[in-house]
Amino acid sequence: MGRQAALAVTLLFVTSFTGCFGVESDGNLFDEDHEKEPLRINHIQMKGTHNSYHVEPLFSPTREYMYTHQTLDLQASQQGVRQFELDVWWDVRGGLRVYHNQYDSGTTCPTFEDCLGTLLEWSNENPMHHPLFIWVEPKDWPEQAADVTTTLEISGLLGDIEQEISNFWPLNQTITPDDVRGDGDNLRDAIGENGWPL
């Protein structure tokens, strides 16, 4: 896994809404006999946060780190956030950890499981919510020396992330890129042929 490889894993938490009511030009709802087209994932616009777990460090080395997000559940309930981005690192002492980098490690949910648990609890308490999108960005460590900079490859990190998701989050409440791809050769062709999920 290269450092330049940006992400990878997306989760869509299934909601009970599979369609929406249309509105006529005069502002009235269509009557029940009017044909309603199901709402697909790509019809949804949402508010998202970057480094969704972030807590401003006590001594910030740069102005870019000078912000703090509310906890994930409060972002969802109070701010209407439906897209979250998590940076996931593998730590030999603690498994999958969530933070920005070694100089900016403040976080509202220290482990990947903590983050998933917070969102799962909110989702279960709000069963009619629109889908949540979770972007998971796997991270690896740069090893720097006077004359060389290399990347420490973390074998199996993606597999560990996918395993933790499948162990922790109910499969009937997730949609992954593999689910959308199905039997297609690739994600792009599958979407072109079948469209985005309802």
Tell what function each PLM region has.
Residues 1-29:
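Secretory targeting signatures
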Residues 28-198:
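Catalytic cores of phosphodiester-bond hydrolases, prominently lipid phosphodiesterases
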